Design a protein with these regions (language model features):
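Extracytoplasmic entry segments of secretory-pathway proteins
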Residues: 59, 81-85, 90, 267, ...
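Glycine-rich phosphate/adenylate-binding loop and adjacent beta-alpha elements
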Residues: 70-94, 99
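Short, contiguous acidic and Ser/Thr-rich linear segments
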Residues: 20-31
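Functionalized membrane-embedded alpha-helices
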Residues: 62, 68-70, 220
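Eukaryote-biased recognition of intrinsically disordered, low-complexity regulatory segments
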Residues: 1-21
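Short, structured protein-protein interaction patches enriched in aromatics and acidic/basic residues
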Residues: 53-65
Length: 309
């Protein structure tokens, strides 16, 4: 079959890009989408034209390197399929396909369909690890893990960090990715000592990378090739509230001006509130204290030895 490809071509992050049309000829249904692009690139090179740049590595849907939009849908729209696994049998002769890179401020374009996803790496570096004493490997059965917790951790660990969730989200949110990485370790006994620190650090890192906020569209789950569920975002939010509470909780110290009236106080003084701070002022003061804590920077990670994978 023959296809028309409208491909986004851009030399660098600072260059001006545009769509350029190409003809992909003699495409067989047994080809993968990337094999079709390989064939097109060979034709471009033979004509001394620059080939189309795109990310790829394992081509087995494992590494998360590949990924771009096909007709506005991440990975082409086949449920649970990365673009490297996408078969050309899903397209028809004469189709026009529009290819463009992930669109997000946190993913600057490197060239053509390639984007810089190092923002994901920095989120993982902020807390995507566990720490343990160095030495010989512990017995495999020394720390028991419940079946439910192991299943949750395994489901979260399936995230390959391809970035489709960010590309599909109207706000370019990375909450599905971040929640998967947090839930993976927070679900295991080995991840409990640094659970609060991990959650706070990774959420702060995500915010600093200028990703958007989640507004419950659910587009991220719909395009995720590994079926990462939205419930992990809920788990992350609960862990974040838990971490903030543990970090900032302290006894509510009632200001000394708030006193119960003694027997000698007159009824007029009690009625007029003389000697007492209004209750709403106390609540407002406490609210401002908590807000100030929440806006503070997260603590530095503890200097511990990370476990090698």
């Amino acid at each position: 079959m023959n296809l028309t490809l409208r491909v986004w071509r851009q030399q660098s992050a600072n260059a001006t890009g545009s769509f350029i049309s190409y003809q992909a000829k003699d495409v067989t249904p047994d080809m993968s989408f990337l094999e079709m692009l390989d064939s097109l690139n060979e034709d471009l090179i033979s004509r001394q034209e620059p080939p189309i740049a795109f990310d790829h590595d394992c081509r087995e849907g494992i590494c998360g390197t590949c990924g771009f939009l096909i007709n506005g849908v991440a990975h082409g729209g086949q449920r649970g399929t990365t673009v490297c696994q996408l078969s050309m049998r899903f397209f028809k002769d004469g189709d026009t396909l529009t290819l463009e890179p992930w669109r997000a401020r946190a993913f600057p374009i490197i060239r053509d369909l390639m984007v810089n996803r190092s923002a994901f790496d920095r989120i993982i570096q902020a807390g995507g690890f566990i720490s343990a004493p160095t030495g010989s490997a512990p017995d495999a059965n020394a720390i028991l893990v419940r079946k439910e917790d192991a299943d949750t951790a395994m489901d979260a660990a399936a995230c390959i960090g391809c970035g489709a969730c960010v590309a599909a989200c109207p706000n370019a949110s990375a909450m599905l990715f971040t929640s998967a990485k947090i839930t993976h370790l927070n679900s295991l006994p080995q991840g409990q000592p640094q659970r609060d620190e991990r959650t706070l650090s990774m959420v702060v890192a995500m915010r600093n990378e200028l990703f958007g906020s989640c507004t419950n569209h659910g587009e991220c789950e719909a395009v995720c090739p590994k079926h990462i569920p939205l419930e992990f975002i809920g788990k992350m939010n609960r862990d974040l509230i838990r971490a903030l509470w543990h970090r900032h909780r302290q006894p509510l110290v009632i200001p000394s001006v708030v006193q119960l009236p003694s027997a000698e106080d007159s009824h007029e003084q009690l009625h007029d509130g003389v000697g007492a701070q209004p209750q709403e002022d106390v609540h407002q003061q406490r609210h401002e204290e908590v807000q100030a804590h929440v806006q503070a920077e997260s603590p530095e990670p503890a200097a511990t030895a990370p476990v090698s994978s």
